[in-house]
């Protein structure tokens, strides 16, 4: 009989052993190799004693998968999923099961990273290009982004673009029509305050009466559901050099005249209605489309068409010089993570339904709205909007209607002025319309849906006037007209997936990105209707499950970070930075020190840091780093003293972007506090802190947390993300507020930074499950194992490559930087060559040239096994041997496996390959482990310069893919 106790047999910590890659024996072997007796001994060697936490976390014990699912099922069951006709940018939708199963629930799609390595990302790049084509066609404009975070932040980006490109250079006022969504106005006002813009609101028709405008914003259709032909108004505004921006409903554009045809300069909106659940506010992809002449001022990523070295059509991210990782504080936006997974879902939705299928859906929604309007009119209810697509507004006995609606499990929109609104959706049926008659009119109304429908068919409908009926063709590309059976759709999705390298194939060692396991059990609740189908503006009593989940997750994050409160609203790390800096700004203003506007940022900082500081209305002053990569204290003291009167804050990353624990971090905090500033600690590297130290304990005042890094939300190929901020008590009143829903800790006058009060709440169950399953012990052990993996890999690679920057006891924290510059000087081989050659070995490249040009930054997470680490090491050692052959002159600098990487099937089938000085086998099967699990790049190295000089960002002819 076994000697194990019942507690041991119950395996409460089984998930912990599944999440962590190396088993106990492998961990000990690795510890022996790096010269440590245990994980605790290694921790003591790495983490400065002055900042060690000195306590265990208090987030509970570890749990098994079944127990974790049972706990979260209890929370889900506390949510009441009513039929929500609230609208306001959030609508019911049917997620095609072929997309649900093969994209949303498929690690081949949700575990990939942003396509910085396009040769191994052609599948999702094509899906994103489809999203851009969809956006271009429906809006009637020229150039679309790869997605933004949500509709409201897209509106703020539209305002910023308008200011950049407007010829009315002296104008400082932005007009917002008073019938836009309230959350949109809220986010726009927040951004405008930072930029010093004046916001004026009023009826849309009065926009042209203002003379000092650089831009204007309109909603199409508006909050009440009214349709307006803006063609004449837009012409008047353009004559005054006003940039016209429009928030549009994507489903309505299937039937309506496009804003581009009316003369809009920029059109944005949410793609949520195209097969993405409401998720209590997100995540959803926003579309953003502009005229071609504004392309250099566009925010966010843009996918463009280029050529590879064989002349084959290939896709890649275009015009990256606009972005934060290059332009820093001069960037158009701080957008980094966006919503690629959700953009892909929306694009696949359009591909699956095609233009004809979309017309059927849109016409059904519109017909049901016509039926509802006709029935109400027949019973004496006056519909306030005279034209509509899917939304009606009317005045009735609000109390009686609300009571009947709640009794029926239905949510309507109740405006402050006694107006009731109803927005219909793809999920609405004729039975639902009959139920709405009962709710609005009471029993005994005698209306029959079929009879009203027959009458409308006979007499026609004028709710969409002829001038607003769409005449432009859309989605004519073959991609949107070829995959309408589930078999063909499934195979199309699979063909694209096969072109991409994700975590389900191999380790992704991107430094500062924390590409850890996104466990299946953590992902499961995301698809549950109790989480997926909740409207963010539903009555709070219906969302008790979400309320408890968000509360518990916030409490855990408070314990982990050492802060006093958490704000869940920011829906990306960059938005978290922005929100944290706004809290600092408002704190200073509350003390009569609004002049404090200088943000100190070390030269090694993430590009989002200076970009976010600029968005928050701050001036960036860069501080130096010493030769070891640490913040130069002498320079910091001098800069802090120099700007003391105006010092707002410092933004630091810990461990540093150089991958070490700086011994002087508390001194850094003290210097800033002594001069009246606040400390913003970037949470990008939190995976090396959890359970060992904490930003609040160190001395920081505010941090954002990348839940899509440290807390297991997947990267989705470029989003979604979540960037909640933790704050000390004195900053808590200054976190983001919301015009529609209060969160509980913010002051009333705080503006919003995201469209939804709790950001992308639909993915918070992932992080909740991650913490619930690992518990206090597992979280700490995960951090320690991540550091063990990093130090093991570093010591192995240091025998072949120079390693920059080490901390105490010659250790690194959780990532290392390999210096390729000496090898480049000796051989001509670049860090780019090594990155592309790793593709041939089946690996995604590490982070290139950040934070130091000419380097590779490698971060192996705790989820990677010793076997996978050894396979990566084997690849890097083999590549070093290849570099040596170039160095010795055996291979020419311009014709070797590195210079020609990555290699494709086309290469090895080409008879001309025989002229190369290396074999086909070495090109594509450089090691036996590669032969056993080969990943084939589908294009050769892509010409970025060609792509930007010949910018094309829409779908190409099908023949180009052949």
From Swiss-Prot:
Catalytic activity: N(6)-[(R)-lipoyl]-L-lysyl-[glycine-cleavage complex H protein] + glycine + H(+) = N(6)-[(R)-S(8)-aminomethyldihydrolipoyl]-L-lysyl-[glycine-cleavage complex H protein] + CO2
EC numbers, comma separated: 1.4.4.2
Requisite cofactors: pyridoxal 5'-phosphate
Record's protein name: Glycine dehydrogenase (decarboxylating)
GO molecular function: glycine binding; glycine dehydrogenase (decarboxylating) activity; pyridoxal phosphate binding
InterPro entries given in the database record: GcvP, GDC-P_C, GDC-P_N, GDC_P, PyrdxlP-dep_Trfase, PyrdxlP-dep_Trfase_major, PyrdxlP-dep_Trfase_small
Subunit structure and binding partners: The glycine cleavage system is composed of four proteins: P, T, L and H.
Summary of the function given for this chain in its UniProt record: The glycine cleavage system catalyzes the degradation of glycine. The P protein binds the alpha-amino group of glycine through its pyridoxal phosphate cofactor; CO(2) is released and the remaining methylamine moiety is then transferred to the lipoamide cofactor of the H protein.
One Pfam family per UniProt: GDC-P
Residues with the N6-(pyridoxal phosphate)lysine modification: 709
Domain of life: Bacteria
Protein family per UniProt: Belongs to the GcvP family.
GO cellular component, one term: cytosol
Cystine bridges: none
Lineage start: Bacteria, Pseudomonadati, Pseudomonadota, Gammaproteobacteria, Alteromonadales
Gene Ontology BP terms: glycine decarboxylation via glycine cleavage system
Keywords noted in UniProt: Oxidoreductase, Pyridoxal phosphate
């Amino acid at each position: 009989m076994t000697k194990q106790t019942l507690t041991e047999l119950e395996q409460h910590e089984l998930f912990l052993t599944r999440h962590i890659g190396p088993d106990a024996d492998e961990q000990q072997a690795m510890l022996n190799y790096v010269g440590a007796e245990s994980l605790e001994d290694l921790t003591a060697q790495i983490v400065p004693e002055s900042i060690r936490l000195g306590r265990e976390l208090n987030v509970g014990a570890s749990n098994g998968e079944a127990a974790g699912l049972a706990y979260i099922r209890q929370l889900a069951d506390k949510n009441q999923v009513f039929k929500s006709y609230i609208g306001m940018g959030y609508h019911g939708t049917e997620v095609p099961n072929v997309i649900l199963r093969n994209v949303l629930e498929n690690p081949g799609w949700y575990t990939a990273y942003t396509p910085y390595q396009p040769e191994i990302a052609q599948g999702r790049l094509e899906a994103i290009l489809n999203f851009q084509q969809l956006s271009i066609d429906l809006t009637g404009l020229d150039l679309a982004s790869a997605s933004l975070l949500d509709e409201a932040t897209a509106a703020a980006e539209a305002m910023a673009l308008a200011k950049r490109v407007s010829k009315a250079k002296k104008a400082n006022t932005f007009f917002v029509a008073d019938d836009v969504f309230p959350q949109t106005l809220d986010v726009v006002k927040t951004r405008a305050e930072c930029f010093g813009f004046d916001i004026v609101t009023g009826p849309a028709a009065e926009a042209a009466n203002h003379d000092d405008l650089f831009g204007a914003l309109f909603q199409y259709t508006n909050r009440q559901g009214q349709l307006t032909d803006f063609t004449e108004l837009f012409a008047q505004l353009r004559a005054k050099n006003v940039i016209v921006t429009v928030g549009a409903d994507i489903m309505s554009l299937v039937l309506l005249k496009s804003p581009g045809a009316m003369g809009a300069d920029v059109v944005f909106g949410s793609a949520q209605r195209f097969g993405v659940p409401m998720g209590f506010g997100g995540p959803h992809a926003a579309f953003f489309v502009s005229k071609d002449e504004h392309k250099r001022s566009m925010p966010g990523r843009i996918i463009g068409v280029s050529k590879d070295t064989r002349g084959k059509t290939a896709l890649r991210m275009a015009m990256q010089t606009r972005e934060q990782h290059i332009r820093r504080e001069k960037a158009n936006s701080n957008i980094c993570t966006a919503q690629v997974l959700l953009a892909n879902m929306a694009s696949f939705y359009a591909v699956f339904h095609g233009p004809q299928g979309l017309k059927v859906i849109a016409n059904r929604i519109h017909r049901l709205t016509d039926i509802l309007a006709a029935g109400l009119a027949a019973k004496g209810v006056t519909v306030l909007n005279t034209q509509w697509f899917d939304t009606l507004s009317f005045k009735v006995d609000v109390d009686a209607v609300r009571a009947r609606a709640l009794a029926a499990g239905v949510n309507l929109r109740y405006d402050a002025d006694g107006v009731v609104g109803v927005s219909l959706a793809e999920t609405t049926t004729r039975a639902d319309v009959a139920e709405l008659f009962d709710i609005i009119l009471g029993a005994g109304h005698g209306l029959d849906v079929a009879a009203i429908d027959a009458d409308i068919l006979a007499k026609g409908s004028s709710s969409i006037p002829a001038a607003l009926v769409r005449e432009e063709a859309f989605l004519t590309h073959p991609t949107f007209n070829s995959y309408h059976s589930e078999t063909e759709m499934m195979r199309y999705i699979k063909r694209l997936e096969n072109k991409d390298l994700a975590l389900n194939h191999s380790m992704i060692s991107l430094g500062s990105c924390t590409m850890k396991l996104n466990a299946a059990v953590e992902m499961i609740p995301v698809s549950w209707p109790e989480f997926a189908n909740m409207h963010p503006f539903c009555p709070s009593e219906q969302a008790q499950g979400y309320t408890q989940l968000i509360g518990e997750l916030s409490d855990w994050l408070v314990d982990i970070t050492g802060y006093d409160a958490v704000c869940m609203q920011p829906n990306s790390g960059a938005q978290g930075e922005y929100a944290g800096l706004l809290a600092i700004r408002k704190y200073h203003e509350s003390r009569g020190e609004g002049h404090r506007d200088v943000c100190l940022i070390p030269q090694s900082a993430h590009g989002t840091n200076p970009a976010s500081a600029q968005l928050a209305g701050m001036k960036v002053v860069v501080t130096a780093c010493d030769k070891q990569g640490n913040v130069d204290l002498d320079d910091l003291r001098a800069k802090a003293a120099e700007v003391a009167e105006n010092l707002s804050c410092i933004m630091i990353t810990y461990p540093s972007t150089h991958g070490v624990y700086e011994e002087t971090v508390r001194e850094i905090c003290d210097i800033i506090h002594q001069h009246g500033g606040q400390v913003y600690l970037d949470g990008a590297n939190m995976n090396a802190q959890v359970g060992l130290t904490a930003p609040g304990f160190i001395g920081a005042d505010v941090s954002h947390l990348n839940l899509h890094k440290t807390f297991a939300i997947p990267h989705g190929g470029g989003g979604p993300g979540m960037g909640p901020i933790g704050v000390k008590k004195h900053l808590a009143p200054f976190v983001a507020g919301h015009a529609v829903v209060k969160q509980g800790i913010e002051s009333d006058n705080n503006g919003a930074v995201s469209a939804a009060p709790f950001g992308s709440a639909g993915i918070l169950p992932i992080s909740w499950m991650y913490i619930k399953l690992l518990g206090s012990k597992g979280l700490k052990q995960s951090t320690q194992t991540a550091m063990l993996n990093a130090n093991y890999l570093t010591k192995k690679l240091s025998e072949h490559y120079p390693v920059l920057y080490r901390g105490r006891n010659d250790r690194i924290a959780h990532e290392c930087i390999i210096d390729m510059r000496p090898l480049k000087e000796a051989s001509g081989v670049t860090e780019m060559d090594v990155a592309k050659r790793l593709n041939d070995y089946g690996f995604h490249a590490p982070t290139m040239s950040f934070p130091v040009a000419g380097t590779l930054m490698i971060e192996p997470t705790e989820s990677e096994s010793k076997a996978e680490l050894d396979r990566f090491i084997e690849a890097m050692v083999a590549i070093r041997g290849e570099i040596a052959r170039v160095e010795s002159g055996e291979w020419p600098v311009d014709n070797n496996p590195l210079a020609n990487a990555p290699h494709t099937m086309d290469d090895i089938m080409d008879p001309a390959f025989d002229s190369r000085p290396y074999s086909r086998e070495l090109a594509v099967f450089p090691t036996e482990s590669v032969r056993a699990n080969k990943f084939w790049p589908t294009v050769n190295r892509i010409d970025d310069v060609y792509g930007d000089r010949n910018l094309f960002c829409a779908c190409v002819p099908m023949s180009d893919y052949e």
